[in-house]
Amino acid sequence: MTQPSLSVLYSDHLRTLTARADQALQRGGFDHLVIPSGTTHYQLFDDRDYPFAVNPQFKAWVPLTRMPHSWLVYTPGKRPTVIFYQPFDYWHVVPDAPSGWWVEHCDIHIIRTPEAALPLLPARTERCAILGEAASALGACVPNNPAAVLDFLDYQRAFKTPYELAVMRLAQQLAVRGHRAAEAAFRAGQSEFGIHMAYCSAVGQDANELPYGNIIALNEHGAVLHYTELGRQAPQPLRSFLIDAGASAHGYASDITRTYAADAGSEFQALIDAVDAAQLRMGNAVRAGMDYKQLHVDAHLSLMGILHDFGIITVSPEAALATGVSAAFFPHGLGHLIGLQVHDVAGFAASDRGGRIERPDGHPYLRLTRVLEPGMVVTIEPGVYFIDMLLDEVKKNGHAASVNWDRVAQFAPYGGIRIEDEVVCTDGDPENLTRPVFAAP
């Protein structure tokens, strides 16, 4: 079956965005939506700039991610206007003129200086909802970020359009290409730095283009949840490899994690296999009407069941959860919304009018508390780790007898396990965006 082109999908996507913007502006009492792309920031006491990070609200409308000093203006009933910054500059590469599937749907004005945008922006700035950072202010056009507008737009961003799902699939394909190269580099005995370079080369993106810093962790480093140090020497012996790495496509992110054992016949490989099977079951529970908080709690029980089966804990999964022992082995949340941002916005939103759904007690790092609905894309990333400081807390809290410390000592040199896919909630069965790409030849 032929898939619609990105041009067709983008046209429908834009209709969805304008409808959302119409309602958001009405709620906030504004006439115009104005979104700056962002500005260049410089390092303290230096003339070196930081890598540019585009305003996510801007790239929701147009797939431009490296365009500081540009603007998006939308007035209900009119086509969106893109003010495109293309400076006269012989120090840097100047952006090419706008092109691609999106240009026919927008009115485009090219400017040569940031200040040239001012006469192209709405004159009555008090009638504008201006979404951006304070540094993007230009004359009287100062970001005000009205809550009524942001609450509505952020909440609705959880529901992905077919265009968004299409480009997120592209981000999956790029990341899986990198994951395959990274595993091959691991099997070849490369260092963390070498594996990272193999990943970037395969994806075709450098550290500034990737949606987040690669986590490339060998052996015990897998116990550091956000390990980003990239050792230059491979440890000996080489036991395990945890990789958490994504890719960017037209402003959208992918976020994938895999764990590998150097010895496919080891008990650690068996533990990986058990977590992998549990992760698939968790992904299959991503269904409309399911409370993500419950998925997170169920994940704790499932993982503790595995640890009990492997003789790592001595108490029931329910007891491990109730006493906090489970949090020592699985200290982060099950996952989060993903899209324009890796940790996409409004994960705690009670409604499109604001409010907050709190995390369950004892789970301070869960990033999503909403009830799942069709169109949401979430990560499912259970993990089991052997983290000294957290296991020491188990002892201090009087629960040492709940853990088989000899078994912990056997697994600790491997660091930990995390497996992460992206899953779409639909009206029926969930769609795993990640597994089919790995399964493809």
From Swiss-Prot:
Residue numbers binding Mn(2+) 1: 255, 336, 381, 420
Gene3D superfamilies: Creatinase/methionine aminopeptidase superfamily, Creatinase/prolidase N-terminal domain
Keywords: Dipeptidase, Hydrolase, Manganese, Metal-binding, Metalloprotease, Protease
GO MF entries: aminopeptidase activity; metal ion binding; metalloexopeptidase activity; phosphoric triester hydrolase activity; proline dipeptidase activity
SUPFAM superfamilies on file: Creatinase/aminopeptidase (SSF55920)
Pfam short name (any one): Peptidase_M24
Enzyme's top EC category: hydrolase
Entry keyword annotation includes Protease: yes
Family label: Belongs to the peptidase M24B family. Bacterial-type prolidase subfamily.
Protein name: Xaa-Pro dipeptidase
Organism this protein belongs to: Xanthomonas campestris pv. campestris (strain ATCC 33913 / DSM 3586 / NCPPB 528 / LMG 568 / P 25)
Lineage, uppermost ranks: Bacteria, Pseudomonadati, Pseudomonadota, Gammaproteobacteria, Lysobacterales
